[in-house]
Design a protein with these regions (language model features):
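A conserved ligand/cofactor-binding region detector
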Residues: 1-820
Length: 820
């Protein structure tokens, strides 16, 4: 049964927590202190369910998926946990009676700094769905001390500062030091013969202790609580008193500093050797700890390690965790003393891999020198996997050295992690139909031809519980009022909204909710940016990681183009528009950071130009993260999904906008293709070259953007403004690198690598269609409602059911709580 809380007991619990934690009465407590007290009271409600869930898993001897990911971009937990416990009204009321507003208390929580982009957010959505559907799972990751970084904008530039999310402790985590695990780096491997077989022993290594912290992942309304297990790195001996007494203070804490470095930040800059080494260390650290712990857990109840795969699946989210293939082999060979063939059979029935990108820079490769020095035993195992695989290739394709060059795991001084994953897994999936097709026909074609049975598609999804129920409560209530609440756990039911799309009263209600959400975002922008934006203007939004293929540059060039038109003709009839950007650029990615500066420079000029009467505004939202994303998705009119076709594997922001009733302007790329199948292309603004056209142009070595520059005076004018000081009077050369990248003047890359100028006119036409369409209020309202009604396919619940059916083969578990 699902226990409901007693409101008065909850109030007592919060008051007691404030006293015990801070030696204060509730009236004296700060909002941050009340947040901690409320979080602990909610955690108390979770604990019984958490224990009951794991007891049920043990009782049923359930198969578990270990979802291994470098990132988990969870967002705040308090609000989500309260919603999934189905206690929102009671708790909001209890806090109101104590004199506090639940939303204000939720705002005290720092977003956990455990991820950055879509990869990490997908992992978080998957965990939410696994718990809600009742499937046994562990998320396995790293407990970063500072995450990627907190973004500040100073003088238009991105400044990276540490994200100190753990400064005041994190109330939802539990330290599990009893499961601490030793992880070994470096040294050498000694071979010892026992008369029957060789034993491989790592000697002269450095060790760190991996200590797990568990965060509960609460299922919606079903008592199921899975765990996100994040590993902290600690020294085996943290403080050497003997060294300290000799006055060698640095040496005394050397081990501690070594360990701490591993978990300091997500994606340390790898433009240099030390950064590369640290990244590989991080990956092996959390994978070794997770794999060792999974094997130990299995052995607590089972004697036959040969059946390990019947009770565990290791799912590798992108290439970062793929060293799991070799680590499981190491344990089976060296610790369980199995022969190679047996160990390989178990490993290849345990590991599954999701490919997230066709961008070659993201398909990780490690220099042999680094890999073999840092992980000597793992390297030996990878060498042997490679030797056997190359033999297989040669048997299959005699004399074809080209196949070996393209497919070998170790080649040309590098260890290719994606190849290790494909060879060592029983399943390889892409994340949208188009992406999987490109993998099979282009990027991984040789592998697909050799082992087609491994390949499958699993189109990504999002959790409607965070991005609609929590992020857009007004719309969620309205939908429930119209069609009931089944959509919360079965998003396909949202299709029932279709019957209301032509109802004028419903259209008005729907757009009124959108307006209220725009007011909420306008307030956020005023508070954080000091910019007044008109909630009646079109909110045109692009929020996502900053990368050249995502083409934020094309968006801001189009804003410059529109501004030029307005300056030439101040009476031009356009619907006022607010262009909203949010993005972090990787710390070492110069051009991406320069693009942020360009957006902010354009914003400064446009927002301060009174002659255009506020018809255009440009806003860059600082430190884009899950908590402000929820506010942004709910308020958007237009969703910018404008990646170069073929480059975006799936995208999930596109789905969040659609669910919240925004209209998409986009290329036929990633999952946007499938969104068009669901809602109809006529209800989106599709533009630009197709994936096939882009791939064909790339195979020919690109195109000549100078022809466009010479023949299109509007585009030429915009590009000249990059180098004539129009947006940087103090430093006219500031944006020269962007100009060069588009026209290949003194640039090492191919001219306009991402086909921005090629697609520009088509993009500008689509943007113009938006201006015309927005004037037809009924059409817009109907189309916005239709987008929400057609988003049922894009729930991560559907995605997870497909993973379970085709890849993981888990069984649902029901959790009943004993009567209190």
């Amino acid at each position: 049964m699902n226990h409901k809380i007693d409101k008065n007991e909850f109030k007592k619990s919060v008051v007691a927590n404030v006293r015990n934690l801070y030696r204060k009465n509730i009236e004296e407590a700060t909002a941050a202190q009340v947040y901690h007290a409320v979080a602990l009271a909610v955690k108390d409600m979770i604990i019984d369910r958490w224990i009951a869930t794991h007891e049920e898993y043990d009782k049923q001897d359930a198969k578990i998926v270990y979802y291994m990911s470098m990132e988990f971009l969870t967002g705040r937990f308090l609000g989500n946990n309260i919603i999934n416990l189905c206690e929102q009204e009671e708790i909001a009321e209890a806090l109101k009676e104590l004199g506090f507003d639940l939303n204000a208390i939720e705002d005290q929580e720092r977003d956990p700094a455990l991820g950055n982009g879509g990869l990490g957010r997908l992992a978080a959505c998957f965990l939410d769905s696994l718990s809600t559907l009742g499937y046994p799972a562990y998320g396995c990751g790293i407990r970063y001390r500072y995450g990627l970084f907190r973004q500040q904008i100073k003088d238009g530039y991105q400044i990276e500062i540490p994200d100190e999310w753990l400064k005041d402790g994190y109330p939802f985590e539990i330290r599990r030091s009893e499961y601490a695990t030793e992880v070994k780096f470096g040294g050498y491997v000694e071979t010892q013969w026992d008369g029957q077989r060789n034993h491989f022993v790592q000697k002269g290594y450095q060790s760190v202790l991996a200590v797990p912290y568990d965060i509960p992942i609460v299922g919606y309304g079903n008592n199921v609580v899975n765990s996100l297990r994040i590993w902290d790195a600690q020294p085996l001996q943290s403080f050497n008193l003997a060294d300290f007494d000799k006055g060698e203070y640095q040496k005394a804490v050397e081990q501690e500093n070594l360990a701490k470095t591993i978990v300091e930040v997500l994606y340390p800059n790898d433009n240099h050797y030390a950064g590369k080494e640290l990244r590989l260390k991080q990956q092996y650290f959390f994978i070794s700890a997770s794999v060792q712990r999974a094997v130990k857990k299995y052995k607590e109840k089972h004697d036959d390690i040969r059946k390990f795969y019947e009770k565990a699946t290791f799912h590798m989210n992108d290439t970062h965790p793929t060293v799991a293939v070799a680590e499981l082999m190491r344990i089976l060979l060296d610790e369980e003393n199995l022969g190679w063939d047996e160990a390989w059979e178990i490993t290849t029935k345990t590991c599954a891999y999701t490919n997230h990108t066709i961008m070659s820079e993201a398909l990780e490769k490690w220099p042999i020198e680094l890999f073999s020095r840092l992980l000597p035993r793992i390297y030996q195992i990878v060498e042997e996997i490679n030797r056997r695989f190359v033999e297989e290739i040669q048997k299959r394709y005699p004399g074809n050295q080209e196949k070996v060059r393209k497919m070998a795991i170790i080649y040309d001084g590098q260890v290719r992690m994606a190849h290790l994953a494909i060879v060592g897994s029983y399943s390889v999936n892409g994340v949208a139909k188009l992406h999987t097709e490109i993998l099979e026909k282009q990027e991984l074609r040789d592998f697909y031809e050799m082992m087609p049975q491994k390949f499958n598609n699993k189109t990504n999804g999002i959790t409607q519980r965070r991005f609609l129920l929590h992020g857009n409560p007004m719309l969620a209530d309205w939908i429930t009022d119209k069609i009931g609440d089944e959509w919360i756990t079965d998003l396909s039911k949202i299709k029932k909204l279709s019957v209301y799309v032509d109802d004028e009263k419903c259209q008005q209600e729907f757009m009124n909710i959108k307006y209220h959400n725009k007011l909420r975002l306008a307030k956020y922008i005023k508070e954080h940016n000091g910019i007044d934006v008109d909630p009646r203007s079109i909110f045109d939004v692009q929020v996502k990681r900053l990368h050249e293929y995502k083409r934020q540059l094309m968006n801001i060039l189009h804003v410059m183009y529109l501004y030029n038109q307005l300056k030439d003709n101040p009476n031009m009839d356009i619907v006022p528009r607010t262009f909203i950007f949010g993005a972090k650029a990787a710390a070492g990615y110069k051009r991406a950071k320069l693009t942020i500066k360009l957006i902010n420079s354009v914003a400064d000029v446009i927002n301060n130009d009174r002659s255009i009467n506020g018809k255009l505004k440009v806003v860059f939202i600082e430190d884009y993260r899950v908590s402000n994303a929820e506010i942004i998705f709910a308020a958007a009119d237009v969703s910018e999904q404008i990646s170069t076709a073929s480059k975006e594997a799936s995208g999930t922001g596109n789905m969040k906008f659609m669910l919240n009733g925004a209209l998409t302007i986009g290329t036929m790329d990633g999952a946007t293709v499938e969104m068009a199948e669901e809602v109809g292309q006529e209800n989106m603004f599709i533009f630009g070259s197709s994936a096939d056209e882009i791939i064909s142009l790339e195979n020919k070595g690109g195109y000549n953007p100078m022809e466009i520059f010479n023949s299109d005076q509007d585009i030429r004018r915009v590009l000249m403004q990059l180098i004539n000081g129009y947006y940087a009077p103090q430093d006219p050369e500031l944006f020269r690198d962007i100009y060069n990248s588009l026209l290949n003047t003194q640039s090492s890359d191919r001219a306009d690598t991402y086909f921005i100028l090629k697609d520009f006119r088509s993009y500008a036409d689509a943007e113009d269609k938006i201006d015309k369409a927005y004037r037809d209020e009924k059409w817009w309202a109907r189309t916005a409602m239709l987008n929400t009604a057609c988003s049922g396919k894009f729930s991560s619940d559907r995605t997870i059911e497909e993973y379970v059916r085709d890849i993981w083969h888990l069984k649902k578990v029901k959790v009943e709580l004993p009567d209190a």
